[in-house]
Amino acid sequence: MKALKLGSLLVMALCLAVTAYAHHSAAGIDQTKTVTQEGIVKQFKWANPHSWLEIEVMNEKGNTEIWNLEMNPPAYLVRAGWKSNSVKPGDKIKFTARPFKNGDPGGLFVNVTLPDGKVLGQNAPRANAPVYETK
């Protein structure tokens, strides 16, 4: 009976490990391409484990669609110069992303050009990275 319980726990632990690995997989992202578009911020989710940026863009057919961009968590973004209010709904921005392979609107965030021309990425420089206030 002890062996059965131990075996069950081991199987459950392995299942959780596979799920965690899949969560951090970039298999659905086309790492060979970047797209740059302009759009209007619909929502900015400043949250763990990932922040999200939702942007309304005009597609090539002239229809609007919402792009969902996965970003790093706030701790990384702060080191890259972000604040929780760096972008707000209604802001017109230009963004670069690595798109989904399946063609759905969205992907992995690379950077954004704000209305004032400031460019924000999602990773701080490796050496001498400054610490920024969050408010």
Model-derived regions: residue spans:
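Extended, charge-rich, solvent-exposed interface segments
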Residues: 118-135
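Short boundary/loop segments of OB/S1/cold-shock single-stranded nucleic-acid-binding domains
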Residues: 20-35
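OB-fold/S1-family single-stranded nucleic acid-binding modules
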Residues: 100-123
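Short nucleic-acid-contacting surface segments enriched for D/E, G, S/T with interspersed K/R
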Residues: 79-94
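Short, structured beta-strand/loop micro-motifs enriched in basic residues and often containing a Trp
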Residues: 71-79
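Bacterial N-terminal signal peptides
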Residues: 7-19
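Short aromatic-glycine-enriched beta-strand elements
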Residues: 47-57
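Conserved hydrophobic positions within beta-strands
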Residues: 37-41
